[in-house]
Amino acid sequence: MARSVSSFKLLGASIFDGLYVSISRRGYSGAPPAAVTASFGRPGAMGKVERRDAMKESSSSETRAYSSAWAPDPVTGYYRPENCGAEIDAAELREMLLNHRVRSQ
C-alpha cells in the first residue's frame, strides 16, 4: 500500500511538471491558430465595414506622416520636426521650478 502511494506521488509530480513545462514554454508560430481564422469565417475575407475602417486608418496615417515635416531650427540651423517644442536648458528649468525663498524664523 505504501509503495503504491509513493509511486502515485511520483507519477503525479512528473505529470504536473510536464504540464507546467508545456504551459510555461514560449514558442513562436508563423501562422495564427485555427480558432482565430475560424472566428472571421474564411481566412482573408473582409467585410465592407472592415474595409472601410482599414481605409480610414490608412488615410489618417498618411496625413499624420505629412504633418510631421522637418524644418530648419532657427537657432542651430539643423533640421528638426516642425511640431517639436523649443528646448530649454536644464539649469534654466531648475531655476524656474524651484522656489528659492528664504524662510525667516
Swiss-Prot record:
InterPro entries in the record: LEA_3a
Species: Gossypium hirsutum (Upland cotton)
Annotated keywords: Stress response
Highest taxon of source: Eukaryota
Residue stretches of biased makeup (Low complexity): 57-67
GO terms of biological process kind: response to stress
Protein name: Late embryogenesis abundant protein Lea5-D
Family note: Belongs to the LEA type 3 family.
Induction description: By water stress; in leaves.
One Pfam family hit: LEA_3a
Region (Disordered): 48-67
